[in-house]
């Protein structure tokens, strides 16, 4: 009898592992936050360079950041979102702009 129970326990463990492995990854919103100093052209550049938007869509998002205080640049897995936030913030600092990029769970 012990063997049967062991197999049932093993089957349950495998089933639990598969269920966990098949869960979609957590997603995160990458957000640009408005400030009074970063030029609009720089924000457009960031949106094109790091999020691959064309100039028209980048301009629309830049205006959303400007008038609404922030805008979602995209929704990504945790690792991708963290990397994009880090790269945008580093690029802004290298260019001496206070532009802030953050993330939050979607």
Curated annotation (Swiss-Prot):
Gene3D superfamilies: 3.30.1390.10
Superkingdom assignment: Bacteria
InterPro entries: ClpS, ClpS_core, Ribosomal_bL12_C/ClpS-like
GO BP, sorted A to Z: protein catabolic process; proteolysis
Entries under NCBIfam families matching the protein: PRK00033.1-3, PRK00033.1-5
Function: Involved in the modulation of the specificity of the ClpAP-mediated ATP-dependent protein degradation.
Similarity annotation: Belongs to the ClpS family.
Quaternary structure note: Binds to the N-terminal domain of the chaperone ClpA.
Protein name: ATP-dependent Clp protease adapter protein ClpS
Taxonomic path: Bacteria, Pseudomonadati, Pseudomonadota, Gammaproteobacteria, Enterobacterales
């Amino acid at each position: 009898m012990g063997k049967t129970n062991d197999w049932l326990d093993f089957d349950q463990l495998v089933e639990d592992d598969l269920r966990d492995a098949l869960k979609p990854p957590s997603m995160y919103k990458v957000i640009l936050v408005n400030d009074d100093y970063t030029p609009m052209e720089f924000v457009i550049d960031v949106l094109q360079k790091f999020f691959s938007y064309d100039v028209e869509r980048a301009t629309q998002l830049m205006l959303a950041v400007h008038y609404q205080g922030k805008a979602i640049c995209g929704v990504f897995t945790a690792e991708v979102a963290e990397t994009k936030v880090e790269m945008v913030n580093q690029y802004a600092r290298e260019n001496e702009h206070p532009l802030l990029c953050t993330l939050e769970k979607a």
